Amino acid sequence: LPGIVSGTELWCQGYSEPGAGSDLANVKTKARFDETKNKWVINGQKVWTSLAHESDWCFVVARTDPDSVAHKGLGFFLVSMHQPGVTVRPIEQLTGTSEFNEVFFDDAVADDILGAPGEGWKVAMALLGFERGVSTLGQQMLFQNELDEIVRIAKANGAAKDPVLRQRIAEAHTGLRLMRYNAMRMLSGSDDGSLDKSSL
């Protein structure tokens, strides 16, 4: 959790799949419990995964019961993106940038499962509820990391001495702090009930 809050660890969501889009009821990615490793092992593919190429971890929705149908028999797994069983292929957009990715899991090991096997649908729906309201927090952390890199480069090449650049960096920093505080306000308001779902 400290890495998430500080923005030093970035997460992506492994929901959408080829042929199923964002229809979680048709997830084909499979998870099986490996008794020798005492861990869940993931096999399958996700697509349109935002920022997977920059992420450290992925929330992966996978089918724990191969005989289950629809939203039953799903698990919600925490998977490190830095392991041999994970392959990320950026999808190039018309602009030449790549925000979205294909992600392949080939015997990738999940560090943990949230909830019990079969409760993945419930966990995923709860997460989507938060995401719709406080997604700005993730954006803020990404932008803050980018601004920190700009400051580092400006200090290294001497551009930080330019008063115009310093003013622009200060304005960007102020805007990012406001963005963060607003997201935190929404989070705390959601917890104490002072903000309902429509406010998020």
Where do the PLM segments sit?
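FAD-binding glycine-rich core of flavoenzymes that anchor FAD
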Residues: 1-17, 35-38
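Internal helix-loop-helix
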Residues: 1-2, 6-7, 51-57, 176, ...
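Tryptophan-centric aromatic hotspots in well-structured domains and transmembrane helices
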Residues: 11, 15, 48, 57-59, ...
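Active-site-adjacent elements of ketosynthase-type condensing enzymes
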Residues: 19-27
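Glycine-rich phosphate/pyrophosphate-binding beta-alpha loops
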Residues: 20-21, 47-52, 94-95
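A structural signal for short hydrophobic beta-strand segments in well-ordered beta-sheet cores
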Residues: 29-32
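A short core secondary-structure module
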Residues: 39-89
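Glycine-rich beta->alpha junctions and the first turn(s) of the following alpha-helix
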Residues: 86-182
